[in-house]
């Protein structure tokens, strides 16, 4: 038992050191806090470094804890997605939520908005939120975790939002999206190979994040995952 405990402690120290290496790299400094929190959480739940790199690569390209999707396509307004135009026009999204952090908005008002969008089955209005930029029903599920963490208050703290998003990521990868991890694990027997990190970043983009221009972004995120893995393990 004592030997097992020592092994667990050594593993945790090693994993924490990997994340510290990653976030100390200036290339990833813009998402330092988010990458550190989610990365350590994934390691705490036993995920391999190459898989962690794949998740973090997608988060690096996708979002920040508690942050709303921006609808401010100032230079190229023609590129603004239709669902964000709808949100801007009907709900004043650009002013109330666009590019803001969840700690700065009213939880009660956001609750009311999400109930309306859910009732319409997300057919016209939705928005990305959080480190994964969850949309539609997944935004609603995340919001329920926000509400649970803040205990009914109208404002949520960053620590509470972080806890909620951590539970969301782990919850998805251990339930409805577990098949993605299982598929990756089956097809990548050598988890310590850089290629395993690339494949993690790629499949997570293709089947978990699914952004616009998915195929091209999956290649980029696979490359980022491989680079992150190299930084973490050197």
Predicted feature locations:
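Short, functionally critical alpha-helical segments immediately adjacent to catalytic or ligand/cofactor-binding
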Residues: 49-66, 169, 203-205
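Cleavable N-terminal signal peptides of Sec/SRP-targeted secreted and luminal proteins
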Residues: 2-15
């Amino acid at each position: 038992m004592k030997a097992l405990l020592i092994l667990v402690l050594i593993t945790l120290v090693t994993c924490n050191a990997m994340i510290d290496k990653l976030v100390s790299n200036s290339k990833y400094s813009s998402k330092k806090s988010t990458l550190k929190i989610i990365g350590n959480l994934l390691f705490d739940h036993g995920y391999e470094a190459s898989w962690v790199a794949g998740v973090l690569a997608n988060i690096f390209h996708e979002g920040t804890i508690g942050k709303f999707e921006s609808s401010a396509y100032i230079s190229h307004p023609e590129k603004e997605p239709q669902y964000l135009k709808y949100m801007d026009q009907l709900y004043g999204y650009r002013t109330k939520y666009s590019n803001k952090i969840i700690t700065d908005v009213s939880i009660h008002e956001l609750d009311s908005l999400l109930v309306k969008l859910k009732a319409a089955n997300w057919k016209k209005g939705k928005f990305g939120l959080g480190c994964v930029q969850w949309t539609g029903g997944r935004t609603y599920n995340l919001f329920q975790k926000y509400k649970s963490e803040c205990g009914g208050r109208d404002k949520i703290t960053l620590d509470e939002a972080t806890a909620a998003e951590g539970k969301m990521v782990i919850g998805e990868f251990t339930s409805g999206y577990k098949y993605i991890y299982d598929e990756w694990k089956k097809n990548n027997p050598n988890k310590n190979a850089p290629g395993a990190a690339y494949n993690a970043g790629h499949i997570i983009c293709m089947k978990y994040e699914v952004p616009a221009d998915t195929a091209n972004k999956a290649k980029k995120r696979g490359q980022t995952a491989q680079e992150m893995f190299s930084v973490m393990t050197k």
